[in-house]
Amino acid sequence: MVLSSNWLSLQKSTDSDSVNKNKGGKKTKSNSKKRTVSVKKDKQYVDKKKKNGTGSKIMDMVANMNREIAKVEQERTKNTHADGQMINSEDRFESVLKQKLNEDVAKKSLSRTNGVGKYVSMDCEFVGVGPDGKDSALARVSIVNYYGNVVLDLFVRPKEPVTDWRTWVSGIKPHHMANAVTQEDCQKQVSNVLKGRILVGHSVHHDLTALMLSHPRRMIRDTSRHMPFRQKYSEGKTPSLKKLTKEILQLDIQDGEHSSIEDARATMLLYKSDKLEFEKLHNKQFGPSKPTQE
């Protein structure tokens, strides 16, 4: 911020108020005269500023600037590790996830939090196939349990040649295909995990279509279709996972390469953040469901 010339003049005139002393500690005659003139000018200047209200405005501007600087410094401190390294969004997400996991795990047995349980969250990543890579092909599937622990994480080998890895958004690279499974094998493993369980996802029908699988509607909880989320954060339209995670969890995801594990965890956290309302609306549509364990 560049201060006005009036503010600089006020600083300069204020500095001239300091009494200059000679080596013996006595005031010089010339300095005394200068001080008298300076005090008069300062008084006239300040009186003029008070009359016009300019001085108070400048002071308010400086105070606001100091407050903004303090906010920036506070945010920088919050986003910095003890060793001075900046915390990226993935680190922050992992930190919050671990905190929430610890809150849940403290109330449950270890076998329960590590097991698959009744609730799972799934997310998929895709690569480009066909001319110019415009068509999408499944390349990774990740499933986590109610507590965010990984249940299944598979890289999938597309049947068609990959023409665009879309690494900048999918996070998929050629070397991931070294241990990739076929789509048929992936489909079988995912089907076994989903059977009899409540599936949490974001626009999950896209992922199910890519897997060529179906799942009972009464067993699906889709954060993209949850009406309270749509009304509050997207004016009734379909909100993005990134937007919901930012608005509700105060976390930034998908800033660079996507991670299907990270997205699946974020989706589960979103569901848990409004679980009671999810189930209330779901029961209105499909009728009361049997109590389920996590």
UniProtKB/Swiss-Prot annotation:
SMART domains: EXOIII (SM00479). Its main location: nucleus. Its EC number is 3.1.-.-. It is an enzyme of class 3 (hydrolase). Residues 23-38 have a biased composition (Basic residues). Gene3D superfamilies: Ribonuclease H-like superfamily/Ribonuclease H (3.30.420.10). Residues 1-56 are annotated as: Disordered. One of its GO terms (cellular component) is nucleus. Residues 119-271 form the Exonuclease domain. Pfam families: RNase_T. Keywords: Exonuclease, Hydrolase, Nuclease, Nucleus, rRNA processing. It comes from the Eukaryota. Residues 1-13 have a biased composition (Polar residues). Belongs to the REXO4 family. Exoribonuclease involved in ribosome biosynthesis. Involved in the processing of ITS1, the internal transcribed spacer localized between the 18S and 5.8S rRNAs. This is RNA exonuclease 4. It comes from Kluyveromyces lactis (strain ATCC 8585 / CBS 2359 / DSM 70799 / NBRC 1267 / NRRL Y-1140 / WM37).
